[in-house]
Amino acid sequence: MNPKGICRLFVSVFIASCVLNLSSVPNAFGTDSLSVSGCSVSYVGYLRDLAWEYERRTGIKIYVRGGGTVGGLENLREGKSDFAATCRNRIEGDPEDVEFVQVAWDALVFIAHKSNPVKNISLEDARKIYFAEITNWRQLNGKNAPIKVFISRTTKSLSGIEASLRNMVLNGKSPVENPNLKFLPSGGIVEQIIEKSPDGFAASGFTSARKRDVNMLKLNGISPTRENIIKKKYPLKRPLFLVVPKNSGPEVKKFINFILSKEGQRFISALGVVSLLDIK
């Protein structure tokens, strides 16, 4: 896909997400509803389904929005949501007086277009892509085409994916900016762009990428499957959190207690997500 096509797709995805958000504006202070926003990996991977199940059981409506870790934490700070979802640990600048509660496991995965003949990548080659030392798919035994790299990033803080990428792959460093590196506002948009970009490459979370029409690359010959993550064969495992104010009301605490219960964790596991029960 050429740059103009990518831009048009981005605009379409952004407008569509805005329409969806406006169609379900939450009442963050209602007694019969809760609201959560944040990490796209959590939103796509388990949070929507969990919210529907919780409403079915309790009658409490949970309004769920994606938009990324940074946006979710900002909404929480500004009182626009009752809690937030994130796929990274706490960093400097995050809201104070909150708790990061781990609710599931995820793994950082590398994704490409379905048609891409490259099916495996080494951790070292992935690192070289982000440092602009590998710039063409031909260098990975693929076709002669530039590697178009997409990363979720905002101006306010580190996204969950980039934080994991820096900590687990890039030895604490930032990706090297170059003409083939594009920044997008959320991981959900990155995944949708990869679905449409034959030369695209990105890091994402297993929990959401498994539900997209993308090619999840093997890493050092190991497939990113739920079984391999549980058995600790696939590396780059990372936690998924819900971020809750320390002074949360009783309904928020009830929801957190449900998700941490054996029943809640079994429901998460049944969705195909790696639950806390799956990894001891």
Identify the meaning behind each predicted range:
Residues 1-7:
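N-terminal secretory signal peptides that target proteins for export/translocation
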Residues 5, 25-26:
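Short linear, low-complexity motifs centered on an aromatic residue
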Residues 9-23:
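Bacterial N-terminal signal peptides
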Residues 28-280:
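Exported/periplasmic ABC-transporter solute-binding proteins
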